[in-house]
């Protein structure tokens, strides 16, 4: 054991060896390099003490240089990395949700590259409002009197409740008390706003008289939460929006609609059910509608508030609005995305989220056949050999939208000859970029819905690397 400890080289020797093996490391931050080298050898020391070293293992610099190099490169690599999405989940929360349109990406780069008119009044040259940058567009697209953008939809709901319902009660159907992901629940957001939740009805059935009976002198608003991430089926009923809006008006109360993922377009032509759009809920009587910018809208992360001008103006004056506001990059990307919606057909072609959701099954089948042929050719021989097959399956919209509805697709499934599909999946997490797919019946499957033709060369490369790595680790 002592001999193993003594064989561990000095940090300076390691720095020199790493620089000789990879000259680009000479430019790496010296302090971080030293810490990474120390971290690597500390782990080796722990393995020695615990008796976990392999028999006859050598801890010389030459023997450990490949492992040390891998550890150092991993430590120097940016934590924020691009990835290939082959899951078929279009709005993949874990992978950054919506992919921005080319126009939106260019707008973000322009805003990031230099100064801009974020809060500059272009008429007077004085202080302006960042809210004005997208408000007119949102009003045109939704039919709202006014609009406000904050940094996500949970923030939008929090701001609305803090402004209009703090210290009072909000009446909500028990069947709409959703969990919105990451263990965050609508009742908890309400509690943080200072509003008191007043549940009405049963989980599966709520009637107009349930809302009416709950209204009292402490009631500040009626609220509907669109259950976009789950469905209640069977013996079920909910109050139609126009009826609830009429009840709210009779009692001089605002009706707040939390649409969650939110949409400006009708997806029924893509084979999906008729979901409420932002313009439709405002037209049917909602005073305020909140929704996300980075889900089926296809833009950057944002919480969008639309509705009555007097209410939106009050929201703008709430000090909490400053804490929740968006920066110039978000607003630039959102404006560019919204401008594409001025031509609905152009939006479906140019906004990746809409394009992927609406890709026809026949087009996906052709894409799968083309990809399968490329994989059979590109992975033939050596440790990368795989059995490649096609399988009819389904994709998901994701992001909590359309949870019950399937999008027909064709999967390209790989069954490796020299490792398991599970080992391949694990190895693909370590490639650059990582490739995320699906495990289906001992196969690793790729859904072309969320891949493009431009991804193919990179996809082939990382698959070859991962198959070789997985096979080597088994040996």
From Swiss-Prot:
The keyword Oxidoreductase does not apply. One of its GO terms (biological process) is conversion of seryl-tRNAsec to selenocys-tRNAsec. Keywords: Cytoplasm, Protein biosynthesis, Pyridoxal phosphate, Selenium, Transferase. InterPro entries: PyrdxlP-dep_Trfase (IPR015424), PyrdxlP-dep_Trfase_major (IPR015421), SelA-like (IPR018319), SelA_trans (IPR004534). The modification N6-(pyridoxal phosphate)lysine is found at residue 295. Its EC number is 2.9.1.1. Pathway: Aminoacyl-tRNA biosynthesis; selenocysteinyl-tRNA(Sec) biosynthesis; selenocysteinyl-tRNA(Sec) from L-seryl-tRNA(Sec) (bacterial route): step 1/1. It is an enzyme of class 2 (transferase). It is found in: Cytoplasm. The keyword Cytoplasm applies. Pfam families: SelA (PF03841). One of its GO terms (molecular function) is L-seryl-tRNA(Sec) selenium transferase activity. Its cofactor is pyridoxal 5'-phosphate. SUPFAM superfamilies: PLP-dependent transferases (SSF53383). It catalyses: L-seryl-tRNA(Sec) + selenophosphate + H(+) = L-selenocysteinyl-tRNA(Sec) + phosphate. GO terms for cellular component: cytoplasm. Belongs to the SelA family. Converts seryl-tRNA(Sec) to selenocysteinyl-tRNA(Sec) required for selenoprotein biosynthesis. NCBIfam families: selA (TIGR00474). This is L-seryl-tRNA(Sec) selenium transferase. It comes from Desulfovibrio desulfuricans (strain ATCC 27774 / DSM 6949 / MB).
